[in-house]
């Protein structure tokens, strides 16, 4: 299986290479720190070389620095170099800090999260002018907070480049803090993270003491945090503002570079199907199918979802697409806990469906699909395949495992490794086999091609 399109070097761990423990040509071997610095310098040269050759801005902490340092459309060589720079820098920090500073660094990260939460709650991001500066005294008055507390927390945030102090007694936006106001996607994610995710993370121990062995989706850290027996989706659906915020956050994640639908387009040989019918199970309002329809004119689509989503999706597709696209896309009301009504489709697509569900429910969902497969049908599962420890870069692995933990905290679910996916297939039907697993470069998700053996 391709994990993320990046070679991890000769030792297969964390993207670094070594020069051997016994030296080369009589020279002493480089220390782990020297190897990391060597890799850092090499990949920094590659990254900066690309940026300079294309007259692109180099990474900077200045207020007008770009939000994204490297376009996701940049060539793979530049993308790999950036990831390796990040990986080497992270490992250098961890290596030089050593075990003695571990707890100090952990608590620093916790404080950054709480400062983000505090700043969001008291509207500090919005009250600081986007241009120029404001005194701590005036800002504290506008926010209704104590000036000393504001100054203490702001200056801690500045150690992580959140805000800046251009002169004593005054605060201004940094590139990062400004982006968390002006970029709607980042702003929504900030509010979601600080109002929902932060209390959920803090309630994990409480949940596991209260329900030590439960995998029920309504007995997770989310339920402990908000003192509810409802599943997360049910709970937020009763709060219109929170539900709308969640929808915007999901849209932002779905359109982020590592979740971009271009990876769905490139992750399977769609053109090789010729004229074919695709059933998108839980396909929402049709973003995936539109992208595929634009690239492959021989494909026709049925998008299945719950009634109000189907109603909205049908309108959106008709209003926002040419007839050549819209006429090839149909909508159908469907509950994936019932038997699949479309029999013998060429493709059954389930994109980001299973990570919300535990093993038993995932088996039920897939079984209902498999019962309607034809002998030549494919089930395409596009979801996370968690890598084996140490087989991808540290910067990628910690994000992937953070998502895995997040699924547990919100739903008592998980992101699965390859063995976890195989276990689901075996529980559904022993005839099922994985035909291929493809992880397009730059994608967090993999396309798992499942067929009847």
Curated annotation (Swiss-Prot):
Induction per the UniProt record: Expression is repressed by glutamine and at alkaline ambient pH and highly induced under nitrogen starvation and acidic pH conditions.
Annotated stretches, region: Disordered: 1-25
Keyword Transferase: yes
Keyword terms, alphabetized: Methyltransferase, S-adenosyl-L-methionine, Transferase
Database matches in Pfam families: Methyltransf_2
Pathway terms, separated by semicolons: Secondary metabolite biosynthesis
EC number annotated for this UniProt entry: 2.1.1.-
Reported consequences of knocking out the gene: Impairs the production of bikaverin. Leads to the accumulation of the intermediate oxo-pre-bikaverin.
Family the UniProt entry places it in: Belongs to the class I-like SAM-binding methyltransferase superfamily. Cation-independent O-methyltransferase family. COMT subfamily.
Described purpose of this protein according to its UniProt entry: O-methyltransferase; part of the gene cluster that mediates the biosynthesis of bikaverin, a red pigment also considered as a mycotoxin. The first stage is catalyzed by the polyketide synthase bik1, which catalyzes the formation of the intermediate SMA76a also knowm as pre-bikaverin. FAD-dependent monooxygenase bik2 might then be responsible for the oxidation of pre-bikaverin to oxo-pre-bikaverin which is in turn methylated by the O-methyltransferase bik3 to me-oxo-pre-bikaverin.
Name of protein: O-methyltransferase bik3
Organism of provenance: Gibberella fujikuroi (strain CBS 195.34 / IMI 58289 / NRRL A-6831)
């Amino acid at each position: 299986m391709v994990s993320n399109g990046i070679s991890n070097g000769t030792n297969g761990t964390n993207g670094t290479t070594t020069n051997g423990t016994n030296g080369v040509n009589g020279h002493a071997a480089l220390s782990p720190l020297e190897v990391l610095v060597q890799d850092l310098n090499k990949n920094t040269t590659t990254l900066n070389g690309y940026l300079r050759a294309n007259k692109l801005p180099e990474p900077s902490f200045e207020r007008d620095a770009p939000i994204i340092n490297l376009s996701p459309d940049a060539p793979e060589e530049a993308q790999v170099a950036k990831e390796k720079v990040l990986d080497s820098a992270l490992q250098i920090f961890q290596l030089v800090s050593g075990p003695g500073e571990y707890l100090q660094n952990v608590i620093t990260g916790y404080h950054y999260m709480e400062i983000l939460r505090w700043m969001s709650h008291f509207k500090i991001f919005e009250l600081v002018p986007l241009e120029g500066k404001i005194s701590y005294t005036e800002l504290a008055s506008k926010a209704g907070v104590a000036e000393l507390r504001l100054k203490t927390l702001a200056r801690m945030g500045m150690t992580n480049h959140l805000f800046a102090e251009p002169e004593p007694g005054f605060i201004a936006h940094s590139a990062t803090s400004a982006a968390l106001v002006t970029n709607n996607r980042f702003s929504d994610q900030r509010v979601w993270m600080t109002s929902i995710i932060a209390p959920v993370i803090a309630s994990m121990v409480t949940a596991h003491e209260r329900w030590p062995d439960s995998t029920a989706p309504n007995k997770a850290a989310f339920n402990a945090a908000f003192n509810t027996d409802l599943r997360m989706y049910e709970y937020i659906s009763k709060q219109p503002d929170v539900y709308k915020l969640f929808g915007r956050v999901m849209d932002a994640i779905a359109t982020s570079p590592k979740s971009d639908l271009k990876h769905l387009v490139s992750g399977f040989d769609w053109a090789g199907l010729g004229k074919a019918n695709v059933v998108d199970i839980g396909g929402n309002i049709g973003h995936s199918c539109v992208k595929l329809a634009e690239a492959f004119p021989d494909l026709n689509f049925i998008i299945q979802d719950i009634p109000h989503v189907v109603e909205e999706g049908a309108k959106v597709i008709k209003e926002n697409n040419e007839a050549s696209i819209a006429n090839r896309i149909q909508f159908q009301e469907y509950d994936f806990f019932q038997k699949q009504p479309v029999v013998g489709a060429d493709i059954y697509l389930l994109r980001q469906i299973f990570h919300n569900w535990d093993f038993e429910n995932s088996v039920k969902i897939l079984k209902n699909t498999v019962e309607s497969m034809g002998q030549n049908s494919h089930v395409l599962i596009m979801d996370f395949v968690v890598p084996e420890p140490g087989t991808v870069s540290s910067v990628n692995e910690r994000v992937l495992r953070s998502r895995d933990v997040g699924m547990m905290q919100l739903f008592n679910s998980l992101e699965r490794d390859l063995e976890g996916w195989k276990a689901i297939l075996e529980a559904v039907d022993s005839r099922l086999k994985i035909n291929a697993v493809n992880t397009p470069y730059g994608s967090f998700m993999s396309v798992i091609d499942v067929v009847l053996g």
